[in-house]
From Swiss-Prot:
GST C-terminal domain span: 94-225
Entries under Gene3D superfamilies matching the protein: 1.20.1050.10, Glutaredoxin
UniProt-listed InterPro entries: EF-GSTs, Glutathione-S-Trfase_C-like, Glutathione-S-Trfase_C_sf, Glutathione_S-Trfase_N, GST_C, Thioredoxin-like_sf
CC annotations in GO: cytoplasm; nucleus
Superkingdom per UniProt: Eukaryota
GO biological process, one term: translational elongation
The name this protein goes by in its record: Putative elongation factor 1 gamma homolog
SUPFAM superfamilies reported for this sequence: GST C-terminal domain-like, Thioredoxin-like
Length: 225
Protein backbone atom coordinates (compact mmCIF):
# COMPACT_ATOMS: atom_id res chain seq x y z
CA UNK A 1 0.00 0.00 0.00
CA UNK A 2 1.27 3.46 -0.88
CA UNK A 3 2.24 5.79 1.95
CA UNK A 4 0.28 8.60 0.33
CA UNK A 5 0.19 11.16 -2.47
CA UNK A 6 2.24 14.32 -2.82
CA UNK A 7 0.48 16.99 -4.86
CA UNK A 8 3.06 19.08 -6.65
CA UNK A 9 3.37 21.08 -9.86
CA UNK A 10 4.57 18.23 -12.05
CA UNK A 11 3.56 19.85 -15.33
CA UNK A 12 5.02 23.35 -15.05
CA UNK A 13 7.45 22.93 -12.13
CA UNK A 14 7.60 26.63 -11.37
CA UNK A 15 6.87 26.65 -7.65
CA UNK A 16 9.95 26.88 -5.44
CA UNK A 17 8.47 25.21 -2.37
CA UNK A 18 7.69 22.03 -4.33
CA UNK A 19 11.32 21.36 -5.30
CA UNK A 20 12.54 19.79 -2.05
CA UNK A 21 9.61 17.41 -1.40
CA UNK A 22 9.76 16.08 -4.97
CA UNK A 23 13.48 15.48 -4.62
CA UNK A 24 13.00 13.72 -1.29
CA UNK A 25 10.38 11.34 -2.68
CA UNK A 26 12.68 10.37 -5.54
CA UNK A 27 16.02 10.22 -3.73
CA UNK A 28 14.73 8.39 -0.66
CA UNK A 29 12.78 5.94 -2.87
CA UNK A 30 9.59 6.60 -0.93
CA UNK A 31 6.38 4.76 -1.70
CA UNK A 32 4.64 8.07 -2.32
CA UNK A 33 2.77 8.94 -5.49
CA UNK A 34 3.60 12.24 -7.18
CA UNK A 35 0.50 13.86 -8.63
CA UNK A 36 -0.39 17.14 -10.27
CA UNK A 37 -3.54 18.72 -8.76
CA UNK A 38 -5.15 18.69 -12.20
CA UNK A 39 -5.03 14.87 -12.13
CA UNK A 40 -7.27 14.65 -9.05
CA UNK A 41 -9.04 17.97 -9.09
CA UNK A 42 -12.12 17.07 -7.03
CA UNK A 43 -10.07 15.54 -4.20
CA UNK A 44 -7.58 18.39 -4.29
CA UNK A 45 -10.18 21.15 -4.19
CA UNK A 46 -12.14 19.39 -1.44
CA UNK A 47 -9.18 18.78 0.84
CA UNK A 48 -7.16 21.91 0.05
CA UNK A 49 -9.48 24.90 -0.43
CA UNK A 50 -6.54 27.33 -0.47
CA UNK A 51 -5.33 25.50 -3.60
CA UNK A 52 -1.68 25.86 -2.69
CA UNK A 53 0.94 23.18 -2.95
CA UNK A 54 2.88 21.10 -2.08
CA UNK A 55 0.20 19.24 -0.18
CA UNK A 56 0.09 15.65 1.03
CA UNK A 57 -2.71 13.10 1.36
CA UNK A 58 -2.14 9.98 3.45
CA UNK A 59 -3.21 6.42 2.57
CA UNK A 60 -6.94 6.02 1.85
CA UNK A 61 -7.25 9.84 1.95
CA UNK A 62 -7.71 9.63 5.73
CA UNK A 63 -5.56 12.63 6.62
CA UNK A 64 -3.90 15.57 4.94
CA UNK A 65 -0.86 17.74 5.48
CA UNK A 66 -0.05 21.24 4.23
CA UNK A 67 2.97 23.58 4.46
CA UNK A 68 6.21 22.66 2.73
CA UNK A 69 8.41 22.41 5.82
CA UNK A 70 5.96 20.09 7.58
CA UNK A 71 5.68 17.93 4.47
CA UNK A 72 9.47 17.73 4.10
CA UNK A 73 9.79 16.63 7.73
CA UNK A 74 7.13 13.95 7.35
CA UNK A 75 8.54 12.61 4.09
CA UNK A 76 12.01 12.27 5.58
CA UNK A 77 10.60 10.22 8.46
CA UNK A 78 8.95 7.85 5.98
CA UNK A 79 12.42 6.78 4.89
CA UNK A 80 13.99 3.56 6.16
CA UNK A 81 17.42 5.12 5.54
CA UNK A 82 18.22 6.15 9.10
CA UNK A 83 21.52 7.72 8.11
CA UNK A 84 19.74 9.98 5.62
CA UNK A 85 17.24 10.97 8.31
CA UNK A 86 20.07 11.83 10.70
CA UNK A 87 21.94 13.75 8.01
CA UNK A 88 18.96 15.84 6.95
CA UNK A 89 17.37 16.55 10.34
CA UNK A 90 20.30 16.22 12.74
CA UNK A 91 21.01 13.53 15.35
CA UNK A 92 18.22 12.59 17.75
CA UNK A 93 18.62 14.46 21.00
CA UNK A 94 20.95 17.07 19.48
CA UNK A 95 18.50 19.90 19.93
CA UNK A 96 21.06 22.61 19.18
CA UNK A 97 21.78 21.21 15.72
CA UNK A 98 18.12 20.51 15.02
CA UNK A 99 17.13 24.02 16.09
CA UNK A 100 19.85 25.53 13.87
CA UNK A 101 18.58 23.50 10.91
CA UNK A 102 15.05 24.72 11.58
CA UNK A 103 16.27 28.31 11.90
CA UNK A 104 17.78 28.35 8.39
CA UNK A 105 14.81 26.46 6.94
CA UNK A 106 12.41 29.05 8.32
CA UNK A 107 14.50 32.04 7.22
CA UNK A 108 14.80 30.82 3.65
CA UNK A 109 11.24 29.53 3.30
CA UNK A 110 9.61 32.68 4.65
CA UNK A 111 11.44 36.01 4.90
CA UNK A 112 14.04 35.33 2.22
CA UNK A 113 11.79 33.70 -0.38
CA UNK A 114 9.10 36.32 0.15
CA UNK A 115 11.56 39.13 -0.54
CA UNK A 116 13.02 37.35 -3.57
CA UNK A 117 9.50 37.03 -4.95
CA UNK A 118 8.91 40.75 -4.39
CA UNK A 119 11.86 41.34 -6.72
CA UNK A 120 11.08 38.53 -9.15
CA UNK A 121 7.40 39.22 -9.81
CA UNK A 122 7.95 42.69 -11.36
CA UNK A 123 10.65 41.15 -13.56
CA UNK A 124 8.11 38.86 -15.23
CA UNK A 125 5.09 41.14 -15.06
CA UNK A 126 3.19 39.21 -12.40
CA UNK A 127 3.18 42.28 -10.16
CA UNK A 128 3.23 45.94 -11.27
CA UNK A 129 6.60 47.61 -10.87
CA UNK A 130 6.85 50.09 -8.02
CA UNK A 131 10.30 51.65 -7.73
CA UNK A 132 10.14 52.20 -3.98
CA UNK A 133 8.90 48.70 -3.18
CA UNK A 134 11.33 47.12 -5.64
CA UNK A 135 14.30 48.94 -4.12
CA UNK A 136 13.24 47.98 -0.60
CA UNK A 137 12.90 44.32 -1.57
CA UNK A 138 16.35 44.30 -3.19
CA UNK A 139 17.83 45.78 -0.04
CA UNK A 140 16.08 43.19 2.13
CA UNK A 141 17.37 40.39 -0.11
CA UNK A 142 20.90 41.78 0.20
CA UNK A 143 20.61 41.95 3.98
CA UNK A 144 19.51 38.33 4.27
CA UNK A 145 22.10 37.13 1.74
CA UNK A 146 24.80 38.73 3.90
CA UNK A 147 23.83 36.35 6.72
CA UNK A 148 24.37 33.38 4.42
CA UNK A 149 27.65 34.76 3.11
CA UNK A 150 28.93 35.30 6.65
CA UNK A 151 28.02 31.76 7.72
CA UNK A 152 29.43 30.16 4.58
CA UNK A 153 32.79 31.87 4.97
CA UNK A 154 33.25 29.70 8.06
CA UNK A 155 31.98 26.35 6.77
CA UNK A 156 30.88 24.52 3.62
CA UNK A 157 27.23 24.13 4.61
CA UNK A 158 24.82 26.10 6.76
CA UNK A 159 24.75 23.85 9.83
CA UNK A 160 27.15 20.91 9.50
CA UNK A 161 30.50 21.58 7.87
CA UNK A 162 30.81 18.17 6.22
CA UNK A 163 27.34 17.59 4.77
CA UNK A 164 24.12 19.24 3.68
CA UNK A 165 21.01 19.20 5.84
CA UNK A 166 17.40 20.03 5.11
CA UNK A 167 18.36 23.65 5.83
CA UNK A 168 20.67 23.67 2.81
CA UNK A 169 18.10 22.04 0.55
CA UNK A 170 15.30 24.47 1.37
CA UNK A 171 17.66 27.44 1.22
CA UNK A 172 19.15 26.42 -2.14
CA UNK A 173 15.66 25.97 -3.59
CA UNK A 174 14.81 29.52 -2.54
CA UNK A 175 18.09 30.89 -3.89
CA UNK A 176 17.47 29.23 -7.26
CA UNK A 177 14.80 31.82 -8.06
CA UNK A 178 17.37 34.57 -7.66
CA UNK A 179 20.03 32.74 -9.64
CA UNK A 180 17.78 32.43 -12.71
CA UNK A 181 16.73 36.07 -12.66
CA UNK A 182 18.86 38.69 -10.90
CA UNK A 183 21.82 36.99 -9.22
CA UNK A 184 23.87 37.56 -12.37
CA UNK A 185 27.60 37.21 -13.03
CA UNK A 186 28.39 40.53 -11.34
CA UNK A 187 26.35 39.59 -8.28
CA UNK A 188 27.97 36.17 -8.10
CA UNK A 189 31.46 37.68 -8.18
CA UNK A 190 30.52 39.68 -5.08
CA UNK A 191 29.03 36.67 -3.29
CA UNK A 192 31.54 33.87 -3.89
CA UNK A 193 30.71 31.83 -0.79
CA UNK A 194 26.98 31.70 -1.48
CA UNK A 195 27.62 30.89 -5.13
CA UNK A 196 30.03 28.03 -4.32
CA UNK A 197 27.64 26.68 -1.70
CA UNK A 198 24.67 26.82 -4.09
CA UNK A 199 26.55 25.02 -6.86
CA UNK A 200 27.56 22.34 -4.38
CA UNK A 201 24.11 21.84 -2.85
CA UNK A 202 22.16 21.54 -6.10
CA UNK A 203 24.32 18.50 -6.89
CA UNK A 204 23.03 16.80 -3.72
CA UNK A 205 21.54 13.35 -4.18
CA UNK A 206 18.46 14.65 -2.36
CA UNK A 207 17.69 16.91 -5.32
CA UNK A 208 17.30 13.97 -7.68
CA UNK A 209 15.57 15.04 -10.89
CA UNK A 210 15.44 18.75 -10.03
CA UNK A 211 18.54 20.68 -11.15
CA UNK A 212 20.08 18.64 -13.98
CA UNK A 213 19.46 21.35 -16.59
CA UNK A 214 19.65 24.38 -14.29
CA UNK A 215 21.22 27.50 -15.79
CA UNK A 216 22.09 30.72 -14.02
CA UNK A 217 21.30 34.06 -15.60
CA UNK A 218 24.20 35.87 -17.27
CA UNK A 219 22.73 39.34 -16.86
CA UNK A 220 20.17 40.67 -14.42
CA UNK A 221 16.58 40.78 -15.64
CA UNK A 222 14.99 44.21 -15.63
CA UNK A 223 11.50 44.99 -14.30
CA UNK A 224 8.66 45.36 -16.76
CA UNK A 225 7.50 48.98 -16.48
Amino acid sequence: MSDGTLFTDLKERKLIRTIVPRGLVRSLKLDVKLADPSDAQQLYEREFPLRKYPTFVGPHDEWTLTEAMAIDYYLIHLSSDKEAVRQLLGPEGDFKTRADILRWESLSNSDFLNEVCEVFFPLIGVKPYNATEFKAARENVDTIVSLYEKRLKKQQYLVCDDHETLADLISAAAFSLGFISFFDETWRSKHPEVTRWFNRVIKSRFFEGEFESFKMCETEMQPIK
